[in-house]
Amino acid sequence: MKELLDSGFIRPSKAPFGAPVLFQKKHDGSLRMCIDYRALNKVTIKNKYPIPLVADLFDRLGSARWFTKLDLRSGYWQVRIAAGDEPKTTCVTRYGSYEFLVMPFGLTNAPATFCTLMNKIFHPFLDKFVVVYLDDIVVYSESLGEHVEHLRLVFQVLRENQLYIKTEKCSFAQPEVTFLGHRIVDGKIHMDTNKIRAIQEWEPPKNVSELRSFLGLIN
């Protein structure tokens, strides 16, 4: 919570309501904070903006020979909550109640809102040399010289919109790219071998929770 406060992502809240906070263990043993917004989501008018179809995205990458994959740093947290709506995001912790100034994970409209933003700012480049899936951005080109110019345009858009990438999760000007569980190289699309291995080694689900985790992996 201190990190979120220091970053200006949350502030103390006086709202008479709030969502509970849960913690989920990640693969490296650290904990991920999750906020249970189910009650809020039930009364939220759903944003019907369509999430891109994965198959359509792969079709656009097939003829490219150079790729850069960009990962936005804490993507949702780069989107400001509308003024006056902050109390709706209140969560209750052992240290008190806090409300988000940026878009938290767990809101039903968060993916569609973020997708709308990405498609809006990259609209001139979509279907030409950029594909976007939520906070994953792939820049693709047929030649290296062309790729450098495409990257310049993309970075200019990110700078103008004050969006920041996580450099350690990015790959620049590569002859192949791994995107949404697939490896794309020489105009061909292959399943990511790490995904195949994970499916093969997955223990048979013993309950509903484990089944959901498995379905999430293979989807």
Regions picked out by a protein language model, each given a short descriptive name:
Residues 1-219:
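Retroelement reverse transcriptase polymerase core
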